[in-house]
């Protein structure tokens, strides 16, 4: 009987200990999640504010005017530098790193 009560008390203490130092499953309101993701895909960035939506006045030959709403979108440049290496079927001299030699333009000195 004492063995059962002592094991029950140990489990109860362990449960209270886990609950007191536990973490919230849904997160706190003040927590900020930050994830760095590397990608070389092009991303469309939408401008906020008055710059994004503009009304342009369009006038035809007949003199009638009408307004056209335009949306301005900007392309974000890729962060990874792309290199163009021409594929050659010729034999390449053996090098330790197995890279083909690249042909660079001459320096302008």
Curated annotation (Swiss-Prot):
Keyword Signal in annotation: yes
Annotated knockout phenotype: No visible phenotype, due to the redundancy with other RGF genes. Slower root growth after (Pi)-deprivation. Triple mutant rgf1-rgf2-rgf3 shows a decreased meristematic cell number resulting in a short root phenotype associated with an altered PIN2 traffic.
Signal peptide bounds: 1-24
GO MF, one example: growth factor activity
Keyword line: Differentiation, Growth factor, Hydroxylation, Secreted, Signal, Sulfation
Biological-process GO terms, alphabetical: cell differentiation; cellular response to phosphate starvation; positive regulation of cell population proliferation; regulation of asymmetric cell division; regulation of lateral root development; regulation of root development; regulation of root meristem growth; regulation of root morphogenesis
Gene Ontology cellular component terms for the protein in this record: extracellular space
Record bears the keyword Signal: yes
Induction, as annotated: Accumulates in both root epidermis and cortex after Pi- deprivation.
Modification sites for Sulfotyrosine: 98
Hydroxyproline PTM positions: 106
Stretches for region Disordered: 54-88
Propeptide residue intervals: 25-96
Top-level taxon of the source organism: Eukaryota
Tissue spec: Expressed in root tips.
Family indicated by similarity: Belongs to the RGF family.
Further information: 'Golven' means irregular waves in Dutch.
Record's protein name: Protein GOLVEN 5
Organism annotation: Arabidopsis thaliana (Mouse-ear cress)
Lineage per the UniProt record: Eukaryota, Viridiplantae, Streptophyta, Embryophyta, Tracheophyta
